[in-house]
């Protein structure tokens, strides 16, 4: 299956380093076989664990409004930086910086293994949602329930890409840009202004402040950031080879495996990159076989946990009640 070895449990305090967030004193680290994962932990250590996964371009601050209601509910809340972002590092200095979907999904399982979490609940969006989908589909024994922001987003990275409607292709301009050398150089030279532009385009009704963006922007200074981002968007468009360890996993993902764990699908009504949320369809119900609910969140774009944290927290608590 291409599954990596379980993570080794190593918790440590972290010093400030390039790409570290301003509140680095709150961050802990744990080693897996591939990553040193930076994460924040809140709530009771005895509470049932809930893992919250951010996307690109973002970091753990995306969940600041979601964490408190979960902690009040008695849960243990774990918020890791995904590979290439913030306090998370690829441990081998000579390893290629890859971030295909199978790697991101395995990172979640490795994180849970390193923390000795037999089961957990999960919510994610963007890259984080894809990781949540993959873990729920391939490891249903580990995932109690999931809130999938963006619905089912597992990709077929093996088949020939099919063109979308012109307006959808325009919204994905950044992917075509990243598939060029100019795009790689542009991201390296302009990572903060480019990421801020994506925030503005993807959540057009969200009026975030300079302070909000600046709390997260240092996470884009991670030395693995550019290579991981470029690989992610090239690999999904057949522009880069994947990690040989995940060949079998990508084959399984290309077959659209069902997610049989209880889930709630959330969509931002004003998502500038995902587009207008699709109408409920048999195809989604077919892959989300135990879906509890499907909701379009008014007043939110792509960054739903930042824009409407109460909707995300409420959905998570609903999933937890339904899976007692």
Predicted regions mapped to residue ranges:
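A short loop-to-beta-strand scaffold at the N-terminal edge of the catalytic core in hydrolase folds
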Residues: 33-41
């Amino acid at each position: 299956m291409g599954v990596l070895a379980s993570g080794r449990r190593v918790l440590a305090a972290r010093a400030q380093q390039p790409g570290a967030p301003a509140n680095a004193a709150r961050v802990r680290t744990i080693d897996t076989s591939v990553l040193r994962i930076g994460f924040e932990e809140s709530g009771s250590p005895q509470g049932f664990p809930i893992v919250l996964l951010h996307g690109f371009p973002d970091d753990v601050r995306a969940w600041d409004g979601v964490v408190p209601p979960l902690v009040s509910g008695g849960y243990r809340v774990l918020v890791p930086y995904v590979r290439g972002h913030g306090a998370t590092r690829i441990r081998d200095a000579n390893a290629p910086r890859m971030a295909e979907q199978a790697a991101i999904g395995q990172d979640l399982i490795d994180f849970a293994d390193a923390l000795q979490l037999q089961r957990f609940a999960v919510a994610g969006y963007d890259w984080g949602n894809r990781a949540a989908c993959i873990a729920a589909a391939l490891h249903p024994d580990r995932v109690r329930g999931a809130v999938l922001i963006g619905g089912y987003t597992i990709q077929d990275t093996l088949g020939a890409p099919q063109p979308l409607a012109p307006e959808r292709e325009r919204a994905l301009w950044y992917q075509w840009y990243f598939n060029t050398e100019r795009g790689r150089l542009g991201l390296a030279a302009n990572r903060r202004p480019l990421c801020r532009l994506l925030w503005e385009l993807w959540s057009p009704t969200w009026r975030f402040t300079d302070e909000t963006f600046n709390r997260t922007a240092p996470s884009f200074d991670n030395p693995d950031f550019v290579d991981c981002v470029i690989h992610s968007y090239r690999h999904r468009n057949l522009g880069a080879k994947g990690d040989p360890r995940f060949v079998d996993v990508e084959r399984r993902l290309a077959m659209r495996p069902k997610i049989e764990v209880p889930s709630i699908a959330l969509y931002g009504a004003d998502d500038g990159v995902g587009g207008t949320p699709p109408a409920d369809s048999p195809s989604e119900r077919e892959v989300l076989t135990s879906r509890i609910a499907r909701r379009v969140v008014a007043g939110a774009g792509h960054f739903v946990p930042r824009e409407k944290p109460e909707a995300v927290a409420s959905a998570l608590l609903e999933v937890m009640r339904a899976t007692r």
